[in-house]
Amino acid sequence: DATSAFGTSKPSGSTLVGTFYDTKQTPGGRPTNLSQDQFCSILSRFVTHGWDEKDLNRFYKSPQQLYAAQFYVPRTSANEAPKAYGCADKVKPSRWIAIYRGKVRAPKSGTFRFVGAGDDVIAVRFNNENVFDYGWFQASLGKQTASTKWIAAMENKPGYDDLKKELKTAGINVPPVTFYKYSSSGHWNRTMGGVVAGKSFKVKQGNVYPIEILISEIPGGEFGMTLLLEEVGMAPMSKDPKTGAPILPLFRTNYGVPKPDKNKEHVPFDEIGIVWESIK
C-alpha cells in the first residue's frame, strides 16, 4: 500500500477515486506529439463539455487508481504524480491529467465555495456544475492566466474587456473575483495573485452530491495544489496575521490532515473543519 499526497493505492473508506492519464502517449504507448496548445484545448473541451472520460480514452491511462481524501500538495517535483500512480517509468512528468470522482454527503446546510489554486491546474465540478478553476492555467479557458492582465481582469479593474468577456462566458471566475494572499505562500502571491475563491453553491444537510476534481501539470517542473472550503457568510476562526486572509479548512472526505513542512512555502489551513463523507 503506497500512500502519497495524491492518494493511497488501496481502496480506503470515504475517499474519491483518482484516475491518471498521460496525453503524450496512446494506450499502446505510441507518442501523440501533442503541442501544449493542443493539450490546453483538450483540457478546455473536457471541462466545458461535461467531463466525459470517453474523450480521454485515446490516451495512456495508468492501471493503478488512487484514493484521496484531500487535495493539498505544497510545491513539489511534477514527477511525484506519475510516481504515486506507479507509472514513473512510463510517463514523463508533463501534460498529465488526474481526475478524482465520487459522491459526497453534505455535513450541513449552507452556501459554500472552494478556495485554492493549482500549479498548474485544479478544477472542480460539484453537482454537475463547474464551481472552481484556478491556477497557473485555467482549464475552462485552456489558457495560462498567471499574469498581471488576467489577474486585473478577474479583479474587475478598468479595461481588459476581452478577457473579462472570456471569464464571463466560462462562468466560473466571473469578475470581480476574491483573491486571498498568505504570508507563507509568496511565490503563488507573486505569480497567481494568491489563491482564489470560486463560485458559490448551496447544499442541504444529508443530501448526496456528485463531485469531480481535475488536476494537471502542463510544462513539467514543479506541481502544487491547495483546495480549501469557505462557508459563505461565516466568520473564519482565524486570519493570517500579516495579510488578514481567512485561515480556512481543507475540503476533505475523512479526518486525516496533511502535515506540511512549515519551513517551506505552503498555504495555511485550519485543521478543524467539517468532513464531506464519501458515499459509494
Annotate each PLM feature.
Residues D1-K280:
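Acidic/polar, compositionally biased interaction segments
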